[in-house]
Amino acid sequence: MKKKPFYKVLYVQVIFAIIVGVILGHFYPSIATDMKPLGDGFIKLIKMVIGPIIFCTVVTGIAGMEDMKKVGRVGGKALLYFEIVSTFALLLGLAATHLLRPGVGFNIDPATLDGKAVASYAAKAHGQSTVDFLMHIIPNTMVDAFAQGEILQILLIALLFGSVLAHLGERGRVVTDFIDGLTRVLFGIVHIVTKLAPIGAFGAMAFTIGKYGVGSLVPLLKLIGTFYLTSVVFVLVVLGAIARFTGFSIIRFVSYIKEELLIVLGTSSSEAALPQLMEKLEKAGCSRSVVGLVVPTGYSFNLDGTNIYMTMAVLFIAQATNIELTWMQQLTLLAVAMLTSKGASGVTGAGFITLAATLAVVPTIPLSGMVLILGIDRFMSECRALTNIVGNGVATVVVSAWEKELDRNKLRQALKGGGEVAPTETTAGV
């Protein structure tokens, strides 16, 4: 197979687009801010097919299961994994902030902070309780779930639809085959849309730099550096240890999904790479049923980057305003963050809303303290999204191995940079 010229490789194009976007945003901010529709348009094109792809992937995966108990088993294992790893992420964020103390020295009087700029985030945070979140998973109508692009609602519909098809067996084969064919068409659309990723990344990055400016980063560089460093440590050490235990290299895995990571970096939304990630995981030997269940669920329940960010941001505000938190208050913070993070999704800005929800339950720290990081949240959003997508990818491989449905030959070939791999029997064990 003839190797592509480097300038035709997608990730090279995305890197170039990001660099050009940064340059335009820095030197011509007024023009750069007008590039926002390019980024928004690309994300909308991807989100256009996310719902149908999740539905089709989950339905065909479940319909092919001989044992319906497996659906509950996979879901239970995934949720258990999510909670354990999320706890590690929260604790790591807490420990890093205590160790590096990025907020010490600001000496800000909370009374001088104007909370008007974050009022809208606070309102959204107060607008949904745990019960509301759970009830929101149930759609008003099937059409409404797809129209609004609600991932968890679509997942619920797909679980029910797939379960019925599995029960019908051969009588439902025509419907199953149709949905399987539709899945191929949808992924074909994704391949076409993905070619526009450099344009989307350019527009989003140009807008970000043009609107907020590189200068807005300077006063809070220590916080940004602490967050990025902690996220890298989490990926290399925590996820790296999990990957090694499962039998693969985290470095090679990150390299395998580099195109998806660059799309996320450019757009600051992990949803922008969801369909491509699902397809890559299947090609890497994960079973379709596990991919279909774990990845969409992980986008609400396994946001490792958001978890690190939340504990770090809360402690930063406390340090900057000279507020001492007791260990009991910090444990309460962890418990609250564990719950509020479940309401976040892969959309840009969701992390800031969940931060507002967390602060609202910890009254010791003023909600107005969020204005301290409002200007740099957009720059931290990229790191949150990158960590989230790596975390969900690793989770899918782990649960597949746990279920003895990981084709390790495919995984090895994929991580070595191999092309299409012939199917082999799935290997057992972790």
UniProtKB/Swiss-Prot annotation:
UniProt function note: Responsible for the transport of dicarboxylates such as succinate, fumarate, and malate from the periplasm across the membrane.
Signal peptide: none
PANTHER family membership: AEROBIC C4-DICARBOXYLATE TRANSPORT PROTEIN, PROTON/GLUTAMATE-ASPARTATE SYMPORTER
One Pfam entry name: SDF
Domain of life, per lineage: Bacteria
Record keywords: Cell inner membrane, Cell membrane, Membrane, Symport, Transmembrane, Transmembrane helix, Transport
Family, similarity comment: Belongs to the dicarboxylate/amino acid:cation symporter (DAACS) (TC 2.A.23) family.
A GO molecular function held by the record: malate:proton symporter activity
Gene3D superfamilies cross-referenced by the UniProt entry: Sodium:dicarboxylate symporter
Protein name from the UniProt record: C4-dicarboxylate transport protein
Intracellular or extracellular location(s): Cell inner membrane
Cellular component annotations (GO), alphabetically ordered: plasma membrane
Predominant localisation class: membrane
Single biological process term from Gene Ontology: L-aspartate transmembrane transport
Upper classification of the organism: Bacteria, Pseudomonadati, Pseudomonadota, Betaproteobacteria, Burkholderiales
Topology class, membrane: Multi-pass membrane protein
Listed transmembrane segments: 9-29, 45-65, 79-99, 149-169, 185-205, 223-243, 308-328, 356-376
